[in-house]
Amino acid sequence: MARTIMLQGTGSDVGKTVLVAGLCRLAANAGLTVRPFKPQNMSNNAAVADDGGEIGRAQWLQSMAARTPSSVHMNPVLLKPQSENGSQIIVQGRVFGQAKGRDYQRLKPQLLGAVLESFENVCAGADLVVVEGAGSPAEINLRTGDIANMGFATKAGVPVVLVGDINRGGVIASLVGTQAILDEGDRAMIAGYLINKFRGDVSLFDDGIRAIEGFTGWPCFGVVPWLQAATRLPAEDSVVLERLARSGTGALKIAVPMLPRIANFDDLDPLRAEADVELVFVRGGERLPADASLVILPGSKSTISDLADLRVQGWDRDLAAHVRRGGRVIGICGGYQMLGRTVRDPLGIEGGRIEAAGLALLDVETEMAPEKTVRNSQARSSEYDVSLAGYQIHLGVTRGPDCVRPSAIIDGAPDGALSADGRIMGTYLHGLFGSDAYRARLLQSFGLSGERRNYRDSVEQALDEIAGELERHLDPHWLAGLLG
């Protein structure tokens, strides 16, 4: 029988994902069979699991930390926002349907069975399963039918450790306040708490620990310092992008418009990690920088809607000027679709406008189709004749004259398009910048000749460093009980 523990937070972005990844790596280093699990995730950053189907990329990273194959059962419910109040629902890796917020609340009891089935699957054969909650259990307005936090924990009988973020301030109030508004049954599930993102002398918080224990009766299982290594992990959500508006001061400036429904933006992390690259995420109300050598249009969960927003910001004019100056453009997935002449959605799959004019930087057209392509892929770059490894998650088929110059051969078939002068490139392959040889050749084409790090190795090293920090700062008796 697998041991289980669930990390829940006093709020969003308290660091649960990194802590789960760190605990998974710590357990894996101790020789345990450990697996991550998140009942419900909301993210447009998706991965293709090793057994096929979509999961949140955070759970994919956690499976990497656990040194175990990823599975759709590690994240049985994935919500991919398409509009301000509506999301596509992925259940056990497959599209289940679409729902707005209130409709989804009514669906949750129906989804609980799939969540518990997946949890049983993940537990089978494991020594330890580390579960991540979503948001906070303090959102008691969402408690009825909950499958993400206490609703899951009580049904599955998983003890909870509450995580508070001291870096944002008010951590004592957030922990004590969470206990105050939980009902008695939910409070009983909490075994203790962790303080995360502490800076400075930990002994200065001794009085805080005593105060929290006095108010709640909960033991403190550790005070975790600010984990600098976590900045080398792939970005999980757009909250992180807001903080990373500008990354690096390198010789090559790359601009990325922050589309409202941006998806799979962790494609850009390998470029962000390069010291000689300045990656600029351009917010609404800002111009695309005129001195950028390359503009990357990232993935989008709603291509037609994001194309309209791109025009509202005037970025279409900025892109046209960029190309006239000799600049280069790469479009990935939804960004590739935007580069063409037209995007059509005759079945209303994206739920918005039926047709939109594209940027006409590539002579191609896209039509959305109900069948979703979801697969891991091996490819070869047509530009640089190097191997690529990545994945595809997209709706739609793109055709046109520029497709006779494919940007890559994926699983033996042509993919994407290149303009006649080679300055505009589109592809459906996510993860191409994570292929070290491709990234090196791309940067060489801009005159950068420095040695390139192995991106995967840098992520592995960061996970090991985080595991080491947790081993040093978590309560040894609690940790010994967890690791058995």
Swiss-Prot record:
Associated pathway: Cofactor biosynthesis; adenosylcobalamin biosynthesis
MF-aspect GO terms: ABC-type vitamin B12 transporter activity; catalytic activity
GO biological process: cobalamin biosynthetic process
Domain GATase cobBQ-type: 251-438
The entry's keywords: Cobalamin biosynthesis, Glutamine amidotransferase
Active-site residues, Swiss-Prot/TrEMBL: 333, 430
Keyword Cytoplasm: no
Keyword Ion transport: no
PANTHER family in alphabetical order: COBYRIC ACID SYNTHASE, DETHIOBIOTIN SYNTHETASE
Family indicated by similarity: Belongs to the CobB/CobQ family. CobQ subfamily.
Free-text function comment from the UniProt entry: Catalyzes amidations at positions B, D, E, and G on adenosylcobyrinic A,C-diamide. NH(2) groups are provided by glutamine, and one molecule of ATP is hydrogenolyzed for each amidation.
Name of the protein: Cobyric acid synthase
Species this chain originates from: Rhizobium etli (strain ATCC 51251 / DSM 11541 / JCM 21823 / NBRC 15573 / CFN 42)
Lineage of the organism: Bacteria, Pseudomonadati, Pseudomonadota, Alphaproteobacteria, Hyphomicrobiales
Gene name in the database record: cobQ
